[in-house]
Amino acid sequence: MEEEQDLPEQPVKKAKMQESGEQTISQVSNPDVSDQKPETSSLASNLPMSEEIMTCTDYIPRSSNDYTSQMYSAKPYAHILSVPVSETAYPGQTQYQTLQQTQPYAVYPQATQTYGLPPFGALWPGMKPESGLIQTPSPSQHSVLTCTTGLTTSQPSPAHYSYPIQASSTNASLISTSSTIANIPAAAVASISNQDYPTYTILGQNQYQACYPSSSFGVTGQTNSDAESTTLAATTYQSEKPSVMAPAPAAQRLSSGDPSTSPSLSQTTPSKDTDDQSRKNMTSKNRGKRKADATSSQDSELERVFLWDLDETIIIFHSLLTGSYAQKYGKDPTVVIGSGLTMEEMIFEVADTHLFFNDLEECDQVHVEDVASDDNGQDLSNYSFSTDGFSGSGGSGSHGSSVGVQGGVDWMRKLAFRYRKVREIYDKHKSNVGGLLSPQRKEALQRLRAEIEVLTDSWLGTALKSLLLIQSRKNCVNVLITTTQLVPALAKVLLYGLGEIFPIENIYSATKIGKESCFERIVSRFGKKVTYVVIGDGRDEEIAAKQHNMPFWRITNHGDLVSLHQALELDFL
């Protein structure tokens, strides 16, 4: 009975064990049963042992739901087990258990073909690479490497594709292809529908044109050295409408995925825009120069243009008249000034007699072709310039005016006739100025030039070495900019024997507009891709050169001319 009173103090047990315990206790407490079955005595004698085993203080009952799926592996638990990992569908390649690489690899973006992949057709289904024929994955298999695309326009575009790419076991590289576009069956992309990935685009069977330029594609990817998964390569393509597609090789570059940075149609070069804009902004009085600019067939081949000042740079003339040269170099002032005056007389003789300086003095031009647009091309072989009634005292070269006789259309045509005749005379006698002079004046000119060459210590001869060296180069040209009026400057060039060095279209007068504006006109003619070198002695050309970021070579003495020639010989200039 004492044992029955102690039962409530025992700990709680499982249902089956409680029943077995109660039966054992009832058998022990029943004397009748113990008398009939001797085995019960042995059970009673062993009761303390069973109480010692069954007594457990830390045993907690559990329900069947408390056991994990590890104990019941035969039963699938969708909420516990992870999603089966997709495996590669390509034969002959290693099976990977995870979608993440165990070892990080750096990404090296490159625009060329990556790691030996053939440039055409290697990424398309059915093409045979080195590893064998690429099989199109079936719907029951999952491809490790897939390409996802996003449509950026509602219209059918040939630039949106999804296709399988051969996996790489080492590096994850950005893939760029310019191969011929082909239609990919929808089954090649439908295999990814069972995977837990974002939405994929299924291709239709639209027909596209055979080929498009590679500049319309952009590749997106990581650009840092962090670890990158090789299981998914996302490629985005940006394209224009096929009707306006045009190649743009000069603008090709890798896109970062932003459509605004993708290459588009090829655009005009800045230098051409600058040339066109500068020509449109020119005033009407400079219309004629376009014809002269178009006559030069070698302008596009030029690499360097040398802009020369005339007086005190190539020739010594003004300092002869003022006597400053005689004072600087210790020469006889009377002889020096006399030689200068004689040369000045011959210059104006040629200008007045043969180059219409009396008519053109008041309507001077910057360039000989500035009024060529007003020339109607009339034959001038029998034309009388002395009786055509032209007077240049009031015209001042103003264009576009039709009021009265001076400055009108007829007046402008007669002015253009004279400048056309000046050009013809210059071209005819640029290598033989003696044809414009009488025999006596021709001999006088020869003596005068020899005398000036002695007085100036062969200044002109030293400068000619550099001029001839530049002229011998096919990609270089000499251009003359002088502050003398155009017609006297042409006469001066002829009399000093420089006609073959400077064609008339390469001579500019800065009397009206200044040297800086002359430089602008020359730059608009030859373009900004050409290198310009300014050679002179004055502050005006130095300032103009600095304004246009042109190198300036100062000439102040004979040594500067010698150094210039040495620099040219060594190809420094």
UniProtKB/Swiss-Prot annotation:
Annotated Low complexity bias: 254-271
Pfam families: Hydrolase
Alphabetical keyword list: Acetylation, Activator, Chromatin regulator, Cytoplasm, Developmental protein, DNA damage, DNA repair, Hydrolase, Magnesium, Metal-binding, Nucleus, Phosphoprotein, Protein phosphatase, Transcription, Transcription regulation
Region entry Disordered, spans: 1-46, 236-296
Cellular compartments per GO CC: centrosome; cytoplasm; nucleoplasm; nucleus
Cofactor note: Binds 1 Mg(2+) ion per subunit.
Sequence positions bearing Phosphoserine: S262, S266, S438, S472
Function of the molecule: Tyrosine phosphatase that specifically dephosphorylates 'Tyr-142' of histone H2AX (H2AXY142ph). 'Tyr-142' phosphorylation of histone H2AX plays a central role in DNA repair and acts as a mark that distinguishes between apoptotic and repair responses to genotoxic stress. Promotes efficient DNA repair by dephosphorylating H2AX, promoting the recruitment of DNA repair complexes containing MDC1. Its function as histone phosphatase probably explains its role in transcription regulation during organogenesis. Coactivates SIX1, and seems to coactivate SIX2, SIX4 and SIX5.
Assembly and binders: Interacts with SIX1 and DACH1, and probably SIX2, SIX4, SIX5.
Name assigned to this protein: Protein phosphatase EYA3
UniProt source species: Homo sapiens
Gene: EYA3
